[in-house]
C-alpha cells in the first residue's frame, strides 16, 4: 500500500513495486479520474460532487477493499491505508512540499501551474473534509505507516530503493 497526497509520486512507486514483486497494481486515483472524465468534470468539480454525494467515495472504497481482500496487490491510494491499516503488510507514505507536487501535476496533466495549484489545493481540502466526515479519519495522522519518505529529498531511484528495501524487510 502506497499512500500520499496528489503529485507525491505514489503511482510511480506503486506501479514499479507491483511489477518488481510480481503483484497486481490498483489505483483509486485512476478510478476517481476516470469517473470525472466520464462525467465531463474537472478533478476539482468531481471533488465538490463527492463532498455532496458520499456514494462516489464509498463505491471506490468498496472496490478497493474487495481488491485488497484478494491479496497479491499493491494499492496506490490516498485513503485506503487508513481503511486497511490492520490488514496491509506494508504501508508507505510518500510526500513532498505542495509546490513540488503542483509542478509534477502540471507537467503530468499538461495544465498551467496556476490551474494545477488551484485544483490541488481544492482537491486536498475536499479529501481531508470527506475522509473526516465519512470515516472519522485524520489524514495528518501518519503514525500508521511503516515508512514515510519525502520524495522531494531523493531521486526517484533512491526513493524507490528505500521503498523496495522496506518491502523486503517486511517479507514481501
Curated annotation (Swiss-Prot):
Swiss-Prot/TrEMBL catalytic activity: CMP + ATP = CDP + ADP; dCMP + ATP = dCDP + ADP
Family: Belongs to the cytidylate kinase family. Type 2 subfamily.
Main localization, broad class: cytoplasm
SUPFAM superfamilies xrefs: P-loop containing nucleoside triphosphate hydrolases
Source species: Aeropyrum pernix (strain ATCC 700893 / DSM 11879 / JCM 9820 / NBRC 100138 / K1)
Enzyme class: transferase
Entry EC number(s): 2.7.4.25
Any one Gene Ontology molecular-function term assigned to this protein's record: CMP kinase activity
Keywords, comma-separated and alphabetical: ATP-binding, Cytoplasm, Kinase, Nucleotide-binding, Transferase
GO terms (BP aspect): pyrimidine nucleotide metabolic process
Coiled-coil intervals, chain numbering: none
Assigned GO CC terms: cytoplasm
Keyword presence, Protease: no
Protein name as catalogued: Cytidylate kinase
Compartments it resides in: Cytoplasm
Residues annotated for ATP binding in this entry: 4-12
Amino acid at each position: 500500500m502506497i499512500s500520499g497526497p496528489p503529485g507525491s509520486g505514489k503511482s510511480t512507486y506503486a506501479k514499479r513495486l507491483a511489477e518488481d514483486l510480481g503483484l497486481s497494481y490498483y489505483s483509486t486515483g485512476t478510478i476517481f479520474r476516470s469517473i470525472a472524465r466520464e462525467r465531463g468534470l474537472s478533478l476539482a468539480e468531481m471533488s465538490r460532487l463527492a463532498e455532496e454525494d458520499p456514494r462516489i467515495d464509498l463505491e471506490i472504497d468498496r472496490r478497493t477493499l474487495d481488491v485488497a481482500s484478494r491479496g497479491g496487490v499493491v494499492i496506490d491510494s490516498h485513503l485506503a491505508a487508513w481503511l486497511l491499516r490492520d490488514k496491509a503488510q506494508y504501508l508507505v507514505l510518500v510526500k513532498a512540499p505542495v509546490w513540488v507536487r503542483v509542478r509534477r501535476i502540471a507537467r503530468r496533466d499538461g495544465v498551467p501551474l496556476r490551474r494545477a495549484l488551484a485544483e490541488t489545493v481544492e482537491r486536498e481540502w475536499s479529501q481531508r473534509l470527506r475522509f473526516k466526515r465519512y470515516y472519522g479519519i485524520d489524514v495528518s495522522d501518519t503514525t500508521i505507516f511503516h515508512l514515510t519518505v519525502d520524495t522531494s529529498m531523493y531521486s526517484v531511484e533512491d526513493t524507490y530503493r528505500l521503498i523496495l528495501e522496506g518491502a523486503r524487510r517486511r517479507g514481501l
